[in-house]
Each structure stands twice: as C-alpha cells, then as structure tokens.
From Swiss-Prot:
The keyword Transferase applies. This is Thiazole synthase. It catalyses: [ThiS sulfur-carrier protein]-C-terminal-Gly-aminoethanethioate + 2-iminoacetate + 1-deoxy-D-xylulose 5-phosphate = [ThiS sulfur-carrier protein]-C-terminal Gly-Gly + 2-[(2R,5Z)-2-carboxy-4-methylthiazol-5(2H)-ylidene]ethyl phosphate + 2 H2O + H(+). It is found in: Cytoplasm. Homotetramer. Forms heterodimers with either ThiH or ThiS.
C-alpha cells in the first residue's frame, strides 16, 4: 500500500483508516497506550462522558491525547434527540476552540442503541447549516445514507451490527450498496468484535472502520489494538489487490499441463 492511498475526510488526509474510541479503558494511560498500538490518527470522544475541560478539577483526556498529536472527533454518545445532540456538539466546539469535525449519533433505544434516523437527519441538517463537518452514525439503509450525503455529511458510518455487540458484519450486501452509491467516505461504525471483522469490512471496500469496545473490552486491549491495525491494513490491501472470483470448480489447473518432464521409464 502506497503513501498515496490515504483516507480523506473533509479535505484532510490520514494514513490510518482505523478510528478508535476513548471510552471503557481502565484509565487514560491505557487509553493512550491502545491508541499508540492501533496507529490511529482520529480518536472519538464522548463529550457527555469524558472530561476534556468541562471539569477543571478532574483529569482531562487532553493531557493524554493532545489535539496536537491526534484529530479529535467529538461525538454525541448518549443523546436521544436532535436538540440534545446539537447542544452537545456546540459545547464541544466551544471547548475545542472552534473544532468543527464531529461525529453525530442520535440513539433511539437505550437497550440496543440503534440510531433514531428521523432525529439523526434533523440534527444533521442543523449542524451542517451551522458549519459543522458531520460524520454520521446511521443504519445500513442505503436510502438513509443517500439522504445524509445529500444533506451535506462528510462521511456516513453505517453500523455493522449493534454497538458493543461484537457480532461482526451482519449485512455485507447493504454495506456494498452504500459503498457503490456514495461519493463521501463510508466507515463501518459499531459491531466489530475481532480482527477478522475489521478485515472483512475493508475487503468489502469500506474506507475505514471505527471501534471502541472491540479493543477496550478485549482481554489485552493493547495487543488487540495492534491486531486491529494489521487487520485494517491487510483488508485494505486485499481490496486494492482484488480477490479471485469465487467458483465451485477451477476452470483450469493451477499448474501448467504442457512442457512437463516425461516420466522416467
């Protein structure tokens, strides 16, 4: 894979196609170690759950994950309405000195964390109008993804399966439809459980993968972060290389049948 094969979001290019969340680790030190092992350049931050300056008397994530070294992606985890999500991202922009690249998620159910698409579309429209560059967590419905792109999203992020489920890629066909129709990056968000899931997403043609639980919830988060880095890189290279067609039988022997050495009598 060449240095020219980069992930470009909102006009900025990145070498890594793996985006990593900062929640659920033992502490901020383990968070930083996992990020380093993953090779990520974009890290998501749940504004409602993580201190990035709101509470000056508490440890701040920014002391371990400084904006000078990573692109921070504030997200609206825990928001269940468009209004709540918009307020949260306005706060993030204020705390991060005008930072405008954000990840929107508006949830519809506290048990399965499935996205509420009507509220997501409403919030997207407002945020784009206010100058935010919005990456959107969404269903794997190609029509909804097209609507998000039409509203001005800089990336669509369909779930592979439910957040935190580790169930992997449940509907590769829908992902492929979304990839084929989209002119903005398509990143799998949610459901990745292990390295092979990340590789499959990349082999399908996704532009990147975002994960948190798959790394933070592993028995060895640092080792899993390293595994995910390799899986994303390997899956991307396999996609670019082009797999052989699936066939029940080979159309021809894999070894030549002419010019063979004659049997010794």
């Amino acid at each position: 894979m060449t240095t020219e094969d980069t992930l470009t979001i909102a006009g900025r290019s990145y070498q890594s196609r793996l985006l990593v969340g900062t929640g659920k680790y033992q502490d901020f030190a383990q968070t930083r170690a996992a990020l380093d092992a993953s090779g990520t350049q974009i890290v998501t931050v749940a504004i409602r759950r993580t201190n990035i300056g709101q509470n000056p008397d508490e440890p701040s994530l920014l002391d371990f994950v400084p904006p000078s070294q990573f692109t921070l992606l504030p997200n609206t985890a825990g928001c269940y309405s468009a209004d709540d999500a918009v307020r949260t991202l306005r706060l993030a922009r204020e705390l991060l000195d005008g930072h405008d690249l954000v990840k929107l998620e508006v949830l519809g159910d506290p048990q399965n964390l499935f996205p509420n698409m009507p509220e997501t579309l409403k919030a997207t429209r407002t945020l784009v109008d206010e100058g935010f560059k919005v990456m959107v967590y969404c269903t794997d419905d190609p029509i909804q993804c097209r609507m998000l792109e039409d509203l001005g999203s800089v990336a669509v992020m369909p779930l592979a399966s439910l957040i935190g489920s580790g169930m992997g890629i449940l509907n590769p066909w829908n992902l492929r439809l979304i990839i084929d129709q989209s002119s903005v990056p398509v990143l799998v968000d949610a459901g990745v459980g292990t390295a092979s899931d990340a590789a499959i997403a990349m082999e399908l043609g996704c532009d990147g993968v975002l994960m948190n639980t798959a790394i933070a919830g592993a028995r060895d988060p640092i080792l899993m972060a390293s595994a995910m880095r390799k899986a994303v890189e390997g899956g991307r290279e396999a996609y670019l290389a082009g797999r052989v067609p699936r066939k029940l039988y080979s159309a021809a022997p894999s070894s030549p049948t002419e010019g063979l050495i004659a049997a010794v009598k």
